[in-house]
Amino acid sequence: MKIITTPDGRLREKSEKVRKIDDEIRGIIADMRKLSLDWEAEHPYELSAAMAAPQMGVLKRIIIIRDDMEDKKNASFTALINPEVIRTEGRVKRDYEGCLSVPSIYGMVPRATKVKVKAMLEDGTEVRIKATDELARTLLHEIDHLNGVLFIDHIRDEEDAFYKMNDKGDLIPVEDYEKEIRDNDELWGEE
């Protein structure tokens, strides 16, 4: 298994609902955790906060969310199966987002600051999650993946919303929006 990146068309497909949590599903979740941490090990300035199954080319409605997004040493993730946004609330705030499947590009993406999500845990327990701020943003980003939506889709026409990371780990605005973003077939694929 590996993390797939743009322009892979599977990132644009809608994922199917998980009908039964079995060894196959648990194996997918284990692979997601491993791939997230492997990616993080190769990116010293970044933290792998979450991942969706489509990012490995598996079109199942499964996401994993890091239990502590402030502590890179804490490598535990919670799996959410069939997560569904019940409602968003609060103000819409712009903040930085990146994605394992969109290499080297970051964006200032508008998202609701509060979200309520229902899902199942790996053991089949149904949960409802009220999330705010960074966790709300992360949940919305990952659930977008399950619907074939990438963070770049929310800001596609906003020239000043795109960033790259320099070799010191700082985010800097992209220099040539047309070339690096708008007309970049590697980013958007065939349309």
Language model regions located:
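Positively charged
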Residues: 1-191
